[in-house]
C-alpha cells in the first residue's frame, strides 16, 4: 500500500505494471510508448519518472489525461484507453473515490464563522505571510502533539483551510470536502468538472453568507456556500484555451484576485503548435456574483507574429509570465502583487520572473521588478533550438511562491519572494519594487522556494530542497534570514532518517511550504517527517513521522507519505497536515489529512 510498502513489494508491483497479459497490456503499452515514454522514460526537471507513477491512483492518471495537464498528449484517446493506460502504469484496477456520505455529520452544526485563529487561502490571509499569531497552543506544548483523527482523501492537493469549526480540503480529482474540524465528520462534498491543485479561500458576502472560493485547471472559479456546499456562482476567468488556475485565489474586501497561468509550456512540445499567445496575469472578480471587474497582465505587450519555426509553424510573442501562486493584497498602497514565471517565447520582456504590482481598483500594471531577464523556457527543449524551442534556452527560474507583504519591527514594510533559483528576494513596495536584498540559500532547482516562505516580522523562514549554499551542501534544511537585511540568522541542516516505506524513493529534501507560529516554524520533508524548529536558533523542537497507516474517520485506511507542496497550517489549536501530497517529481504519495492536537484531544 502507499505508506508501508517495502522495496520488494515496490519491485513486484513495478513488474506487474510493466508486464501483464499480452492481450490486456499491449494496447496500453503501445499508447505509453507512442505518447508518454519520450518524457517519463527520460525524465528531466518537473517530469516524474515512470516508477514514480506507480504509487499513484489509477483515477489520478485518468484525471490527468482527461482533464489535467496531460490532456493534450491524450487527445483522441477513449475513456477505456485512458483507463487501460492508468491500470498499466499503476498495476492496480481502476479505483473509486471515497464515498462522500461516509461519516456524514449527524447534525449540520454552526455555520462557519470568520475571525481570529482561522486560515484562509494559501498564506493564511491576503498578505500571504504564512504566520499564525493565534495558534491555540504554544512552543511548550509541542512534545505533546498527537494525531487526533485522520481523513483519507486520495489525490489530496491544496492545503487545509479553516473557518470557525469547519475544515476545507481539496483533491486534485476535483472534489472539495467540508469537514467538522473537531471530529473529521463530513459536512458536505462538492465536485467540479476539472482537476484542482490549490487551496480554497474563505470570505463573507454582502448578505452575510460565508463562501468558499476556488479555481481549477479549466480556469473556472466557483463560489460555494461554506455551510451547505451549494454552488453560488461559476465564472470562466480567462478565455485563452490553455488557461488554468493552479494558485489559490485571494479574497479581500468583497473581491477575489485570481492568478492565471497556462499549459503552453507542455503543448509547445508539438512543433505544429503556434507558440505562444498567452500572457499571465491576475483577474479581479466580484465575490458576490463572480462578475469580472478587471484583468491585468504581467506582460504589457500583446503577442504578435514573430518567426517561423523549423517545422514551418508561425510563432508569436512575447508570451508567458504565468502566475502560479496566490496574489498578495496591499490595502495601504491600493496594489495587488503577483509573482510571475518564465517566458514561453520571445522577445524578452520585463514581466517574466518578476514581482508585478497591479492597481487594486483598475488592474493597471503599476510596476514590475524583474529578478531574471531572458528566461525564455519550454518543457523538454533541453537546449535544442528546434521546433518551438527558444534560442538561447532559459533556466526556468520562476517565481512560484506568493510574494509576502511583511511589516518589520520598525514599521517598514517589505515584499519577500522566493524563486526556483534558490534565491530569496526582498523588494521595497514604496519604491516601485526596488531590490532591497537577495540571498542565495540553495543551488536552485525545481523544488526550491516553490511553495511558500513564512515570516514573523523579524525573520523570513525558508525550507531548502536542493543542496544548501549556507550550511552543509546536502538536500533539506531550514534557513532564517533577517527581514530587513537578508542576513543569515541560522541554518539547520535536514536530518536523514530512514523512510517508513524503505529505501526506494526515500529522499530528505524539504520543498513544502513552511508555516510559522510564535516561537516555532513547521517544515515537512519528502521522508514524511514533519518538524518544528525554534525561530530563535533553528533547534528542532519536535519531530513526527507522518508516513504511517491510519484508521480514517471516513471508514477506510489513510496512508501517509511525502510532505510536499501544500503541507500544514495551524488554526484554533490544531495542526492540520497533508501527508502524501506529493507533487509531480515526489517519489511517495499518500492520502492522509491529519488533525494533530495537544495530547490528541
Q: Residue locations for each model-derived region?
A:
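Sequence/structural segment immediately N-terminal to covalent heme-attachment motifs in c-type
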Residues: 25-42
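Extracytoplasmic electron-transfer domains, predominantly the class I c-type cytochrome c fold
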Residues: 38, 47-93, 255, 335
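Blade/loop signatures of beta-propeller domains
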Residues: 103-148, 298, 302-303
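Repeat-blade elements of multi-bladed beta-propeller folds
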Residues: 116-123, 154-175, 193-221, 244-274, ...
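A short helix->beta-strand "capping" segment at the edge of beta-propeller domains
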Residues: 133-154, 310, 389, 495, ...
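A structural motif specific to WD40 beta-propellers
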Residues: 146-148, 185-188, 230-234, 293-294, ...
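Beta-propeller blade signature
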Residues: 225, 277-291, 351-364, 475-486, ...
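Surface-exposed loop and turn segments in beta-propeller and other repeat-based domains
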Residues: 236-239, 293-317, 365-394, 440-443, ...
Amino acid at each position: 500500500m502507499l505508506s508501508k510498502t517495502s522495496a520488494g513489494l515496490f519491485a513486484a508491483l513495478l513488474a506487474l505494471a510493466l508486464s501483464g497479459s499480452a492481450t490486456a497490456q499491449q494496447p496500453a503499452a503501445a499508447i505509453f510508448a507512442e505518447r508518454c515514454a519520450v518524457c517519463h522514460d527520460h525524465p528531466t526537471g518537473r517530469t516524474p519518472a515512470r516508477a514514480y507513477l506507480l504509487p499513484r491512483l489509477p483515477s489520478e492518471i485518468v484525471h490527468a489525461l482527461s482533464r489535467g495537464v496531460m490532456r493534450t498528449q491524450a487527445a483522441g484517446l477513449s475513456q477505456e484507453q485512458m483507463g487501460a493506460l492508468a491500470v498499466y502504469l499503476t498495476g492496480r484496477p481502476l479505483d473509486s473515490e471515497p464515498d462522500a456520505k461516509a461519516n456524514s455529520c449527524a447534525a449540520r452544526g454552526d455555520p462557519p464563522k470568520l475571525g481570529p485563529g482561522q486560515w484562509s487561502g494559501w498564506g493564511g490571509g491576503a498578505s500571504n505571510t504564512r504566520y499564525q499569531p493565534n495558534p491555540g497552543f504554544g512552543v511548550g506544548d509541542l512534545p505533546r502533539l498527537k494525531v487526533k483523527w485522520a481523513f483519507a482523501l486520495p489525490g489530496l492537493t491544496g492545503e487545509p483551510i479553516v473557518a470557525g469549526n469547519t475544515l476545507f480540503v481539496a483533491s486534485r480529482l476535483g472534489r472539495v470536502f467540508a469537514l467538522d474540524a473537531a471530529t473529521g465528520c463530513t459536512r458536505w462534498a462538492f465536485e467540479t468538472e476539472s482537476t484542482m491543485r490549490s487551496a480554497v479561500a474563505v470570505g463573507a458576502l454582502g448578505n452575510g453568507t460565508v463562501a468558499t472560493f476556488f479555481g481549477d485547471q479549466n480556469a473556472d472559479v466557483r463560489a460555494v456556500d461554506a455551510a451547505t456546499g451549494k454552488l453560488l456562482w461559476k465564472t470562466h476567468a480567462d478565455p485563452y484555451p490553455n488557461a488554468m488556475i493552479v494558485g489559490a485565489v485571494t479574497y479581500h474586501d468583497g473581491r477575489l484576485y485570481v492568478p492565471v497561468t497556462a499549459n503552453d509550456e507542455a503543448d509547445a512540445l508539438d512543433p505544429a503548435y503556434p507558440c505562444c499567445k498567452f500572457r499571465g496575469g491576475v483577474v479581479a472578480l466580484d465575490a458576490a456574483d463572480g462578475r469580472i471587474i478587471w484583468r491585468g497582465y504581467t506582460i504589457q505587450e500583446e503577442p504578435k507574429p514573430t518567426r517561423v519555426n523549423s517545422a514551418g509553424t508561425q510563432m508569436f510573442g512575447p508570451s508567458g509570465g504565468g502566475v502560479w501562486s496566490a496574489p498578495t493584497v496591499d490595502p495601504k498602497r491600493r496594489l495587488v502583487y503577483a509573482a510571475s514565471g518564465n517566458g514561453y517565447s520571445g522577445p524578452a520582456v520585463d514581466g517574466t520572473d518578476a514581482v508585478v504590482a497591479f492597481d487594486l481598483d483598475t488592474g493597471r500594471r503599476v510596476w514590475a521588478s524583474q529578478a531574471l531577464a531572458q528566461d525564455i523556457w519550454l518543457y523538454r527543449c533541453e537546449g535544442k533550438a528546434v521546433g518551438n524551442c527558444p534560442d538561447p534556452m532559459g533556466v526556468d527560474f520562476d517565481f512560484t511562491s506568493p510574494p509576502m507583504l511583511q511589516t518589520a519591527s520598525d514599521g517598514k514594510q517589505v515584499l519577500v519572494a522566493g524563486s526556483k533559483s534558490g534565491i530569496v528576494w526582498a523588494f521595497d513596495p514604496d519604491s516601485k519594487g526596488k531590490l532591497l536584498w537577495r540571498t542565495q540559500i540553495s543551488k536552485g532547482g525545481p523544488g526550491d522556494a516553490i511553495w511558500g516562505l513564512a515570516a514573523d516580522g523579524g525573520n523570513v523562514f525558508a525550507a531548502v530542497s536542493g543542496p544548501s549554499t549556507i550550511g552543509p551542501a546536502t538536500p533539506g534544511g531550514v534557513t532564517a534570514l533577517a527581514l530587513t537585511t537578508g542576513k543569515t540568522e541560522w541554518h539547520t541542516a535536514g536530518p536523514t532518517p530512514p523512510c517508513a516505506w524503505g529505501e526506494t524513493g526515500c529522499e530528505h529534501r524539504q520543498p513544502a511550504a513552511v508555516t510559522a507560529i510564535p516561537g516555532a516554524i513547521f517544515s515537512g520533508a519528502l521522508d514524511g517527517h514533519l518538524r518544528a524548529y525554534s525561530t530563535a536558533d533553528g533547534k528542532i523542537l519536535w519531530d513526527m513521522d507522518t508516513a504511517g497507516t491510519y484508521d480514517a474517520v471516513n471508514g477506510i485506511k489513510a496512508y501517509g507519505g511525502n510532505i510536499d507542496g501544500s503541507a500544514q497550517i495551524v488554526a484554533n489549536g490544531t495542526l492540520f497536515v497533508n501527508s502524501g501530497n506529493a507533487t509531480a517529481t515526489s517519489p511517495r504519495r499518500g492520502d492522509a489529512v491529519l488533525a494533530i492536537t495537544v495530547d490528541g484531544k
